[in-house]
Design a protein with these regions (language model features):
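Structural alpha/beta core scaffold segments of enzyme domains
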Residues: 2-419
Length: 419
């Protein structure tokens, strides 16, 4: 039975404020099966793959793979809608499986509002190919022409009135190889059942009842938690660390110096001092107890006021015109009423409610990662290069994301978990 507790606004804000830091989990023993239940669904053992995005189970359940990251935009729901519509699946028989990082899916970087624009056509084709397989399996069973059979809501019906459910056709359907996608007719828009229809968020119930798993929820009995004290200036390096007080805190296991990045900073791990502990609270307290002297580096002389003035000077200096039509300045100068206002904002802080978070498991020369990532393939490549192993030795599981805003498309926090 689920347990509920009161969380008033004040307590929520106070608790949330404490989470404003990278939280990582790293563990060295155990197995993936020991991760707590609730991680986004994985394929059933008896599932058979129909194509890249669709798998069929003997009980008639259809598993649709979502290869993009869910961060509140309902992409897991949308992808399932598209596939299920074209294959004429009963929505109640559809289960969404979260795809791991894998080049076979093509681009998995979930940013730029591109998921549907770039994938809708092939998702429709994948669904239609399964509908084709079901229709042809039924036709073969009955010894009739496929064009006398139609698929509607998880069953195939013949013009004579005979019907077979998808469950009854799974084994036979998987023996058919559909033609190239261009030869399989797609539904007309007027026939859409789920596409362009408001559907309930498939993860909504789990989210509001606390059952949903985000990256910080991933745990194993042997997991440790790490938080990092960053240099006060980007690109800064460690001059000296006094970790005695931190190590004296109950629950703190170790203190590790993370080297500053080499070359262009971009989205490399930024370095700092990591406190590794048995629990998050001990890690936070250990970080507070650290005494660190820093070298500010080349950015130590950066002045935000001077940078602001540089931007203003750039605006007021002659620039190339992207588009010019009429004499805008003359019209403004001759206007009877003028309203002028200046607006300035500092560099954007991409600060999702859930901080970047990843867990890494090392076993037999390979690493498995659970991360709130928008770009699992970037995590794979970065971690593999950092550890000096082949990319196929890195498995990246994508959890639900508590917001992303593009920040979590960068692999630095997964790399730090695996460091």
């Amino acid at each position: 039975m689920s347990q509920y507790f009161d969380m008033n606004r004040r307590r929520f804000l106070k608790t949330s404020a404490a989470a404003g830091a990278l939280v990582m989990g790293t563990y060295f023993m155990g197995a993936a099966s020991r991760v707590l239940a609730g991680v986004l669904a994985q394929p059933a053992n008896d599932t058979r793959q129909a194509n890249l995005f669709v798998a069929l189970r003997p009980d008639g359940v259809v598993e649709v793979t979502c290869h993009r990251s869910e961060m509140g935009q309902q992409i897991r729901t949308a992808i399932a809608q598209i596939v299920a519509d074209e294959m004429e699946a009963d929505w109640n028989m559809v289960k969404v499986i979260q795809g791991k990082g894998d080049p076979k899916y093509g681009d998995q970087n979930t940013d730029g509002s591109r998921s549907i624009r770039y994938n809708m056509q092939r998702l429709r084709e994948m669904g239609a190919s399964v509908r084709y397989m079901m229709q042809h399996a039924a036709a073969a069973r009955w010894g009739v022409a496929p064009d006398t059979c139609s698929a509607v809501q998880h069953k195939v019906t013949h013009t004579s009135g005979k019907t077979l459910s998808y469950k009854e056709l799974v084994a036979d359907a998987l023996t058919f190889t559909p033609p190239v996608s261009e030869e399989i007719p797609l539904k007309d828009k007027s026939e859409w059942r789920y596409i362009n229809t408001g559907m309930a968020h498939i993860d909504l119930h789990d989210i509001v009842t606390g059952k949903a798993t985000f990256a910080a929820d991933v745990r194993t009995p042997s997991a440790l938690v790490a938080v990092i004290l960053r240099p006060p200036v980007v690109g800064g390096t460690i001059k000296n660390v006094d970790s005695a007080a931190a190590k004296a805190i109950k629950g703190v296991v170790d203190v590790v110096e993370i080297p500053a990045p080499k070359g262009a900073l971009q989205f490399q791990p930024k370095g700092g001092v990591a406190v590794i502990a048995n629990n998050t609270w001990a890690a936070w307290q250990g970080r507070k107890a650290l005494k660190v002297e820093w070298n500010d580096g080349a950015n130590g002389s950066y002045n935000s006021d001077a940078f602001k003035q540089q931007l203003l000077d750039t605006v007021n200096s002659p620039q190339s015109h992207v588009r010019e039509k009429g004499d805008a300045l003359a019209r403004l100068n001759n206007a009877d009423d003028k309203l002028m206002a200046d607006y300035y904002v500092p560099h954007l802080a991409q600060a999702p409610m859930e901080p970047p978070c990843a867990t890494a498991l090392f076993s037999n020369g390979a690493v498995e990662i659970w991360a709130a990532t928008q770009n699992p393939q970037a995590d794979m490549a970065t971690v593999a290069a950092m550890l000096g192993i082949e990319q196929d030795k890195v498995t990246v599981n994508v959890t639900l994301l508590g917001g992303g805003f593009g920040r979590k498309s960068k692999p630095d926090f997964s790399a730090e978990a695996a460091y």
